[in-house]
A protein has these predicted regions:
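Residue-level hotspots within pore-lining transmembrane alpha-helices
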Residues: 25, 29, 33, 63-67, ...
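Hydrophobic transmembrane alpha-helices of multi-pass small-molecule transporters
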Residues: 62-65, 177-182, 207-211, 283-286, ...
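Short runs within selected transmembrane alpha-helices of multi-pass transporters and secretion channels
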Residues: 140-158, 166-174, 195-210, 289-292, ...
């Protein structure tokens, strides 16, 4: 039974093993990837450099968000094309993702390198952390084409169920990054510049491996510019399908900038504590995202071939699994929170504040996991407008006002509770949207948006 036959008829729980497990591995790799820089910088005991990493995190997040726009949208569109047997659509989608990533990466590299000082001012870098932040932004900006392309390809390659290739590409990148971190940061004394350079080199290596896999083992995928001729509607559909997750990531980066701006009034200790606790707290949510990302092509594939019943069955089990795993991991992280914080910094003030921040953020992680499943269901079934609305609510319309209101009401303590409160509200809205959309699917009331997605 090949990958497409498994998606169509295989036992659902086995699908999670074959599709979500590799994606979970990718997410774990990304967690390690994000933690490695903080770990090696933190060992030096320089709170200013740790704060600089926290301040510049939204820059890397924004690059990943733009990669998600093409990668996640391309994965869904390609899976729908495969499910419908449309080879022309598959070629157009994959070609658009490749050239779009290349062009966008080159543009962002030029802008980021030229305006690094201005970007750091906008990020809220203070006197102690500004120089370090600028160094990081300049290097990571120049490497944007590699970072962007690696993110896009690791998503698109999953469209036909090739989860192992995505896992290997991300795994290689992380392995190289983690191996280079101590050399560049500590041995060569490059500090945050070394962290950025290791990230770029790791992404370049992962990108090369993924390109090799696509060229050799996915002949239906195309990088030919000619495949785009007269296919602008399909290209727009890729952007529409990728927009929900991209909006979520980009808004998260923007919210991070605003949050850091509010934290700056409490000093570098508060920024560093939030940065470290955020890296640890992402573990549970990232695993839930891996579950949802891994299984999403199966939902899209079945929806694209007209089997709504199976698509809904997979979606229900995805939500249950994401919630359960997030709950278990949140509990484990809560128990080990002191050890986690101490592993990343020796600053007692940062540890004390960070452990409190981590404990609060973990309370709503199970709901955040289920929220990810809701977003994946809406995106996979082509309901891009609902998924976009959810993303805007979670990271913008709910989070930002809540952040300012709670900071005004309770200061730093209020800021610490913002994420948890927003997760609860976003989950309630997501459930309501998914129930309404499920009923319409069962009644056959798909509407033009999802009908177009299924055919694209």
């Amino acid at each position: 039974m090949n990958a497409q036959e498994r998606m169509a008829r295989g036992p659902v729980w086995r699908l999670f093993l074959s599709m979500s497990l590799p994606a979970i591995t990718v997410m774990l790799v990304m967690v390690i990837y994000n933690m490695a820089d903080v770990y090696f910088i933190g060992r030096a005991g320089d709170t200013a450099q740790v704060a600089a990493l926290a301040l510049t995190g939204p820059v890397y997040g924004a690059i990943q968000g733009l990669g998600t726009l093409l990668g996640s949208g391309g994965c869904t569109a390609a899976a729908l094309a495969l499910g419908g047997g449309d080879k022309r659509a598959l070629s157009a989608v994959t070609s658009f993702c490749f050239w779009g990533a290349l062009g966008m990466g080159a543009l962002l590299a030029a802008v980021g390198a030229a305006f690094a000082p201005n970007i750091c001012v906008m990020l809220g870098a203070g006197a102690d952390s500004a120089e370090y932040a600028e160094r990081y932004v300049r290097v990571i900006s120049l490497g944007t084409p590699c970072v962007l392309m690696a993110g896009v390809l690791s998503n698109v390659v999953r469209a036909d169920g090739s989860m192992r290739a995505a896992m290997l590409g991300n795994g290689l990148g992380t392995l190289i990054n983690v191996a280079l971190d101590p050399l560049l940061i500590e041995v060569l004394g490059m500090g945050v510049e070394g962290a950025a350079l290791a990230t770029v080199i790791g992404n370049a290596a992962g990108c090369a491996l993924l390109l090799r896999h696509i060229i050799r083992k996915q002949p239906g995928f195309s990088f030919a510019p000619g495949a785009l001729k007269g296919e602008w509607r399909r290209c727009l559909n890729v952007l529409a399908l990728g927009l929900p997750l991209a909006v979520s990531t980009l808004l998260s980066s923007c919210a991070g900038v605003l949050n850091n701006g509010l934290l700056a009034q409490y000093g570098d200790t508060a920024i560093a504590a939030m940065g470290v606790s955020g890296k640890v707290g992402m573990l549970a949510v990232m695993i839930a995202i891996g579950i949802c990302m891994g299984i999403q092509p199966a939902i899209s594939f079945n929806f694209g071939r007209g089997d709504a019943k199976r698509a809904l069955e997979i979606s229900r089990k995805t939500a249950a699994l994401a919630f359960a795993v997030s709950a278990l991991l949140s509990g484990a992280c809560y128990v080990a929170r002191d050890g986690f914080m101490a592993a990343f910094t020796s600053d007692a003030a940062v540890i004390e504040l960070g452990r409190a921040m981590l404990a609060i953020s973990l309370t709503a992680c199970p709901l955040a996991g289920a929220y990810q499943a809701c977003t994946a269901f809406l995106q996979a079934t082509g309901k891009a407008s609902y998924a976009i609305a959810l993303s805007v609510l979670r990271q913008g319309a709910l989070y930002v006002p809540c952040m300012y209101i709670m900071n005004g009401a309770a200061g730093l303590n209020g800021l610490m509770y913002t994420g948890a409160v927003t997760d609860v509200l976003a989950f309630a809205i997501a459930i309501a949207m998914c129930i309404g959309w499920k009923r319409r699917i069962l009644r056959g009331e798909l509407g033009e948006e999802s009908t177009t997605a299924a055919k694209s």
